[in-house]
Amino acid sequence: MKVLNPGERSVLVQYVQLALNRAGYDIRKDGILGENTCRALQQFLRKKSGEEFNCKIDDVVWGKLFPYLKGYTMHEIKSGDTLWGIAANYDTSVSAIMTANPTVNPLALRTGSILAIPFSFSLVAEDVAYTSYLNDWILEGLTVRYPFLVQGNIGKSAMGKEIPYLRIGTGEREVFYSGAYHANEWITTPVLLKFAEEYAHAFAAGRMQIGRAHV
């Protein structure tokens, strides 16, 4: 990822601010790496690892922000862990953890095993600009949160970017939704991603019967 320095203005700074918002810091997503954003980031890093910070966002700092952009983190099971305790520690739900880890027996957790832990916030942001970076992070997060989603690519754009798809279901009749296919016109991207997120969430919660459908 690009290194960001104090005073920088870019959509990537918006993503830093989005991650900090999700981590509990009330700052504006104005795309400016200014004093308020730096202060929030200092507090975030100090809480996470006790590190001091000079407001230069490098790969190490990005790595600490990524869970809040992808919507999940990984947890190594320790002796005495329970799903209920893990869920409380990460402020999420047991059902969300079970959806992301469908093969796990909640009554027989294996010490040393790794769990994907979805955070409780909605993954698809509605108040930031979209780029291929954010699109990729969201797709990764959705497929971790809802492993019954299948992700692939149908080719590459004129700019050399992969064109991804999500699929759900295995039925004979297919319904295909597409968008964001004219150069840098991204406005339909969050619409489709939000639709996919809400659809997958409803299916995981048993609120709809889609048994033989493609999305």
Language model: regions and residue ranges:
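Calcium-binding motifs, dominated by EF-hand helix-loop-helix domains
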Residues: 5, 25, 29, 44, ...
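Short solvent-exposed coil/turn linkers within tandem alpha-helical repeat scaffolds
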Residues: 27, 31, 51-56, 103-107
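Acidic, Ser/Thr/Pro/Gly-enriched interdomain connector segments
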Residues: 1-31, 36, 68, 75-78
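Active-site catalytic microenvironments for nucleophilic, acid-base chemistry
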Residues: 19-23, 44-47, 194, 198, ...
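Short, basic alpha-helical nucleic acid-contact segments in DNA-binding proteins
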Residues: 44-51, 67-71
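Residues within the helices of the helix-turn-helix
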Residues: 14, 18, 39, 84-85, ...
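Short, solvent-exposed alpha-helical surface patches in non-cytosolic proteins
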Residues: 35-46
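M14 metallocarboxypeptidase catalytic domain recognition
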Residues: 35, 59-214
